[in-house]
Amino acid sequence: MTNRFPAPDYHFSYRKAPVSGNTINGLGEMSQRRARQVFHGSGARKLEWSALETFFGLTMPLQIYIRNALNRWELRKADGPLARKRTPVPDSAKMSKQLKSIARHAGAGAVGITPMTEYALYEGQTADYQSAIVIALPQNYETMRAVTTVKAAAETVDTYRDVSRIVMALAAHIRSLGWRARAYGESADLLHIPLAINAGIGQLGKHGSVIGTEFGSNFRLASVLTDIPLVMDSAVDIGVDDLCLGCQRCTIDCPADAISERQQWVRGKKKWYVDFDRCVMYFVKTFGCGISVSYTHLTLPTICSV
């Protein structure tokens, strides 16, 4: 069955197109380097595509704009003071289990721990922490079936708010033990996807998002960076590469024709990659799109495990 989504016809365009987002992202580069911010910037540098991002924000319905503003306001609590006395951690495995339990009790759908790497940071940014606790929070499946509409956009923003609250609470708990911890609830400052993959949340899919065993791709990510001693999880192989090679669901569904059938070299690594220039225009038109995340086969409730 073919889903009916808005056509990739745009009432907006650049008079002078900026440098390709694919170039900024390092498409075709054989040497490893850190990513550069290209959209949803943190203000660390002037983005080549900032005009489109501004347009995206200005054309958002008021309810979405307010939700985003409230999320940004709440993230002021991402960091905070440490307890004066540090609680020793003689058993890092026990501490890892406790923190995962706290996160799940707060609503997290999946939790993984991985060493922090500089390649999870954008070029020019620093974050001197030992490890990352990655949280995945599922979105409401039925609501997300309305992708490309304001209804689905509101669900996405609300899920980002909820997962941000989880990581802020978890970071605050770690700081109460006397250990440094900072919550990251947005992708503007941290690349959550590579951390999630390394933490065993899932694998990268053809559509550029993580596919996991519990929720498919229908979830949002946030992370806590910390120095508290923890036991690291490992990346998993759940057969996503083989699945994506034989599946064309997202490539067929994508109105912008932005999803490639083959892996490509990106900043020194061969992986699945979505054409930024094609994707971002449709993303802006449709309140954040979300088609591939919601309609990937493993997202469907009846077949969401492998």
Task: Describe every region a protein language model picked out.
Residues 1-233, 238-241, 291, 305:
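Auxiliary alpha/beta "docking" domains used to position bulky ligands
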Residues 231-291:
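Cys/His-clustered metal-coordination modules, chiefly Zn-binding fingers
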